[in-house]
Amino acid sequence: MPPANPHLNHTGGCTKTEEEEAASSEEDSGSFHGSGVCKWFNVRMGFGFLSMTHREGICLDSPVDVFVHQSKLHMEGFRSLKEGEAVEFTFKRSSKGLESLQVTGPGGAPCVGSEKKPKGTQKRRSKGDRCFNCGGPNHHAKECQLPPQPKKCHFCQSISHMVANCPIKAQQLSPGSQGKSTTSTGEEEDMSHTPLLPESTD
């Protein structure tokens, strides 16, 4: 009875295990070298595909797709690839297809990468790149070429006061909010006094 179980479940565990063993032995047997260009790369998701034109130095008849994940890119900072960027890489054959192991620029140089950055990263960086001394872009206050500037109001840019005491900001806020509340309060007071007068006279 125990020997019959593997044969009954032939399409289940046994075959799958043999395929996995074959795939893992293929992966262990080594990696291959290829070169080509980046076909596409999603900077937000961090993966894409390479279009391999040469394998082990031999030109291929037609390009072959090789999966690439950002963790395999040889470069500093934010890792990404630019569409059409020339690359060299090592790759392996897996159950999912061809997957890159390490990706570099030509001659082992670092990858160039895409100018595109995920939207969240762009917003954070643009705020961080403003100088709080002069207000200029692309540098920080500690790197500013100008001497320390006087503190100024963030609302009207005047150096005579801070934003908390800004008269222009106070003027813009007061007509809308305070004017309406004063008028409605005044009307309520007038209306509350008006009904009392006729009742007291009668």
Curated annotation (Swiss-Prot):
Using the record's annotation, list all stretches that form the CSD domain.
33-106
Q: Provide ranges: composition bias, Polar residues.
A: 171-185
- Keyword Transferase among UniProt keywords: no
For the keyword Zinc, the answer is yes
* CCHC-type Zn finger ranges: 129-146, 151-168
Q: Which residues carry this modification: Phosphoserine?
A: S174
| Bias type Acidic residues, positions | 18-29
Residues given in the record as Zn(2+) 1 binding sites: C131, C134, H139, C144
Q: Name one GO cellular component term.
A: P-body
Question: Where does the source fall among the domains of life?
Answer: Eukaryota
SUPFAM superfamilies recorded? Nucleic acid-binding proteins, Retrovirus zinc finger-like domains
Q: How does it assemble?
A: Monomer.
**UniProt cross-references to PANTHER family, sorted A to Z:** PROTEIN LIN-28, PROTEIN LIN-28 HOMOLOG A
The record's comment on protein family reads: Belongs to the lin-28 family.
Entry function: RNA-binding protein that inhibits processing of pre-let-7 miRNAs and regulates translation of mRNAs that control developmental timing, pluripotency and metabolism. Seems to recognize a common structural G-quartet (G4) feature in its miRNA and mRNA targets. 'Translational enhancer' that drives specific mRNAs to polysomes and increases the efficiency of protein synthesis. Its association with the translational machinery and target mRNAs results in an increased number of initiation events per molecule of mRNA and, indirectly, in mRNA stabilization.
The protein's name is Protein lin-28 homolog A
The source organism is Danio rerio
- Gene name of this polypeptide: lin28a
